[in-house]
Amino acid sequence: MALVPMVVEQTSRGERSYDIFSRLLKERIIFMTGQVEDHMANLIVAQMMFLEAENPEKDIYLYINSPGGVITAGMSIYDTMQFIKPDVSTFCMGQAASMGAFLLAAGAKGKRFCLPNSRVMIHQPLGGFQGQATDIEIHAREILKVKARMNELMAKHTGQPLEVIERDTERDRFLSAPEAVDYGLVDSVLSQRT
């Protein structure tokens, strides 16, 4: 079990302790770290929905350090980001790869950032299936549809032509923070909080 630091606050009614992530959630900060999978996605979606209900006018800040993960889990986060009223500002710290990069680019325009030593990696969806030939064919068609849809959305969020996205995601493509800005995945590199 991972150790989660506690924060103790003094109030007029005494002391109150929070785990660090709950305290940061009060500041509208959500962390997306590790593999994108269903449990993580459900927690992130729930936090976004809670913050929207609490104040639909204030931005939400999503900090990403992820190697990517399950497409359907990531798409639930993506759809929620697009659906809710508050802007979701995205920050890459460490790495945003695969679905992590996709969600980084999906932040509100002008509010997508990388820290200076972050790296971003884009590529096509990964998948594997075994079974009868007909079932393999069905799954192959489905992953090609998912690939086409993700490329369309990546083109929309980066401003890159679809053909460029299709070419660049054919294999793993790594970008430094400044390269991610040039590509349109993020809007700027932040070296210090202002």
Curated annotation (Swiss-Prot):
The active site is at 98 (nucleophile), 123. Pfam families: CLP_protease. One of its GO terms (biological process) is protein quality control for misfolded or incompletely synthesized proteins. The lineage of its organism: Bacteria, Pseudomonadati, Pseudomonadota, Gammaproteobacteria, Enterobacterales. Keywords: Cytoplasm, Hydrolase, Protease, Serine protease. It comes from Sodalis glossinidius (strain morsitans). It is found in: Cytoplasm. It comes from the Bacteria. This is ATP-dependent Clp protease proteolytic subunit. PROSITE patterns: CLP_PROTEASE_HIS (PS00382), CLP_PROTEASE_SER (PS00381). Cleaves peptides in various proteins in a process that requires ATP hydrolysis. Has a chymotrypsin-like activity. Plays a major role in the degradation of misfolded proteins. Fourteen ClpP subunits assemble into 2 heptameric rings which stack back to back to give a disk-like structure with a central cavity, resembling the structure of eukaryotic proteasomes. The gene is clpP.
